[in-house]
């Protein structure tokens, strides 16, 4: 292994090295300090006479006389079934006090986006136990469905609840969760670890924790380690894997930080111009492959700076993914948990995973009717603020009351409350029964006769 002593410049986490031989992109590098200590890095960029290396830890102690060895290998993740139940650092090292992972394979962390021709269409419903997701913005196996949140909102709690409760109802196949947190505080890391251990969810999970004081470079690697692990569990072991990535905003900030250190020409709001491509290289690793048993489903979580849904991170994520779940500051102020606003939320693949043979025949109609009724009631709140409640017609008051009922009964649920899809749909019918039957214009008459509490109870009484 040839050793160079031609370090030209050090800038933040980057080391610039003069070279005379071809060096591979993303090649692993060992930097040897004067005392023999070795720091690892990766080739970020290469030109005719210069190589840019990003160091996985601080560059403290690296000098122009330090030795640089190019290994000729890329980063590989040691993977195996024994990873389930383990908590790892953002660089894939065990931090739970357990033994080192004995790898069954070592896989390149860059992976590969699934060939579009090899993709199978998502069609299986994933039950999260949260009514606003299951009932109105359904998650489908193989989908990538982000959560858009804001600073100070309980997206971490929502992420933990999904990680704990997610399952494919009626399936006998194994289900696993890969949870990767990026740029979190030590307090948040402790909270995540304690909740996984308290609830027993850790048994079927692999957890990666990258802390805020860890190098920015590690934040770029963490989601790739998580997705490589998920792909192994899904496509080698045949498991259904849900990958939760939080917080993608911290990931993008790390991209911006490294881009600034490389003196790149910035794009929108200082983020690199290639951020769209970079995010796509992560999100497109979700899906189902024809002929394979397993699947990878993604829920990336991001905090929108200033609650701005047009911010580049949210904007680009929305282009690549298949919908969004929006966490509302207004609902959070009302003390409602989980504060998911169904009106701007959307699951583009919802119709593929609901209905007869998937959830229940009335699912789509109930969802559409609740959405329409809540939207109308929510609009009436603005009118009430101007003209007062007394100026409303009897019909309008009914819809206004439905909006309050929807938020307090359907949206609101406990942190440990796990509702089945049947519970969610039955609750939806219960709320819709507060509206006159003639106002249920989006539901077929035969479904009303079968599921509406008024007719359902009357039918049961007649049978007796």
UniProtKB/Swiss-Prot annotation:
<comment type="similarity">
    <text>Belongs to the ATPase alpha/beta chains family.</text>
</comment>
<dbReference type="GO" id="GO:0005524">
    <property type="term" value="F:ATP binding"/>
</dbReference>
<dbReference type="GO" id="GO:0005886">
    <property type="term" value="C:plasma membrane"/>
</dbReference>
<keyword id="KW-0813">Transport</keyword>
<keyword id="KW-0472">Membrane</keyword>
<dbReference type="InterPro" id="IPR005724">
    <property type="entry name" value="ATPase_A1-cplx_bsu"/>
</dbReference>
<keyword id="KW-0066">ATP synthesis</keyword>
<comment type="subunit">
    <text>Has multiple subunits with at least A(3), B(3), C, D, E, F, H, I and proteolipid K(x).</text>
</comment>
<keyword id="KW-1003">Cell membrane</keyword>
<keyword id="KW-0375">Hydrogen ion transport</keyword>
<dbReference type="InterPro" id="IPR027417">
    <property type="entry name" value="P-loop_NTPase"/>
</dbReference>
<dbReference type="Pfam" id="PF02874">
    <property type="entry name" value="ATP-synt_ab_N"/>
</dbReference>
<keyword id="KW-0406">Ion transport</keyword>
<dbReference type="GO" id="GO:0042777">
    <property type="term" value="P:proton motive force-driven plasma membrane ATP synthesis"/>
</dbReference>
<dbReference type="InterPro" id="IPR020003">
    <property type="entry name" value="ATPase_a/bsu_AS"/>
</dbReference>
<dbReference type="InterPro" id="IPR004100">
    <property type="entry name" value="ATPase_F1/V1/A1_a/bsu_N"/>
</dbReference>
<dbReference type="GO" id="GO:0033178">
    <property type="term" value="C:proton-transporting two-sector ATPase complex, catalytic domain"/>
</dbReference>
<comment type="function">
    <text>Component of the A-type ATP synthase that produces ATP from ADP in the presence of a proton gradient across the membrane. The B chain is a regulatory subunit.</text>
</comment>
<dbReference type="Pfam" id="PF00006">
    <property type="entry name" value="ATP-synt_ab"/>
</dbReference>
<dbReference type="GO" id="GO:0046933">
    <property type="term" value="F:proton-transporting ATP synthase activity, rotational mechanism"/>
</dbReference>
<dbReference type="InterPro" id="IPR000194">
    <property type="entry name" value="ATPase_F1/V1/A1_a/bsu_nucl-bd"/>
</dbReference>
<protein>
    <recommendedName>
        <fullName>A-type ATP synthase subunit B</fullName>
    </recommendedName>
</protein>
<dbReference type="InterPro" id="IPR055190">
    <property type="entry name" value="ATP-synt_VA_C"/>
</dbReference>
<dbReference type="Pfam" id="PF22919">
    <property type="entry name" value="ATP-synt_VA_C"/>
</dbReference>
<dbReference type="InterPro" id="IPR022879">
    <property type="entry name" value="V-ATPase_su_B/beta"/>
</dbReference>
């Amino acid at each position: 292994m040839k050793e160079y002593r031609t370090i030209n410049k050090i800038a933040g986490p980057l080391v610039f090295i003069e070279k005379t031989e071809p060096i591979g992109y993303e090649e692993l590098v060992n930097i040897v300090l004067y005392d023999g200590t070795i720091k690892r890095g990766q080739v970020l960029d290469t030109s005719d006479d210069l190589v840019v290396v990003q160091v996985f830890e601080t560059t403290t102690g690296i000098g122009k006389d330090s030795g640089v060895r190019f290994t000729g290998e890329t980063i590989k993740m040691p993977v195996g079934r024994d990873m389930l139940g383990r908590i790892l650092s953002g660089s894939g090292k065990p931090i739970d006090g357990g033994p080192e992972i004995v790898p069954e394979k070592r896989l390149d962390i860059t992976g590969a986006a699934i060939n579009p021709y090899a993709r199978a269409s998502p069609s299986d419903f994933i039950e999260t136990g949260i009514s606003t997701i299951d009932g109105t913005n359904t998650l489908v196996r193989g989908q990538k469905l982000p959560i858009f949140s804001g600073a100070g909102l309980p997206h971490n709690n929502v992420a933990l609840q999904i990680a704990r409760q997610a399952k494919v109802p009626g399936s006998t196949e194994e289900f696993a969760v890969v949870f990767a947190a990026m740029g979190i505080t030590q307090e948040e890391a402790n909270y995540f670890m304690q909740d996984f251990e308290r609830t027993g969810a850790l048994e079927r999970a692999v957890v990666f924790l990258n802390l805020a004081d860890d190098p920015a470079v590690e934040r770029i690697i963490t989601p790739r380690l998580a997705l490589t692990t998920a792909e192994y569990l899904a496509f080698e072991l045949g498991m259904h894997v849900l990958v939760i990535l939080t917080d993608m905003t911290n990931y993008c900030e790390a991209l911006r930080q490294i881009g600034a250190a490389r003196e790149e020409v910035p794009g929108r709001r200082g983020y690199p111009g290639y951020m769209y491509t970079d995010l796509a290289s992560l999100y497109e690793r979700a899906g189902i492959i024809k002929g394979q048993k397993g699947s990878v489903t993604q829920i990336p979580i991001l905090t929108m700076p200033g609650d701005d849904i047009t911010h580049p991170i949210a904007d680009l994520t929305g282009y690549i993914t298949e919908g969004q779940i929006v966490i509302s500051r207004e609902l959070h102020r009302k003390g409602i948990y989980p504060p998911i606003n169904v009106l701007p939320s959307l699951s583009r693949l919802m119709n593929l995973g609901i209905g007869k043979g998937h959830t229940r025949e009335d699912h789509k109609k109930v969802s559409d009717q609740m959405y329409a009724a809540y939207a109308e009631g929510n609009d009436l709140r603005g009118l009430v603020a101007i003209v007062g409640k007394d100026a409303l017609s009897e019909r309008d008051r009914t819809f206004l009351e439905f909006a309050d009922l929807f938020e307090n009964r359907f949206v609101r649920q406990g942190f440990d409350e796990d509702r089945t899809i049947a519970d969610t749909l039955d609750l939806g019918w219960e709320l819709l029964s507060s509206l006159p039957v003639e106002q249920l214009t989006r539901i077929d008459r035969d479904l009303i006769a079968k599921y509406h509490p008024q007719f359902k109870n009357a039918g049961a009484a007649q049978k007796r």
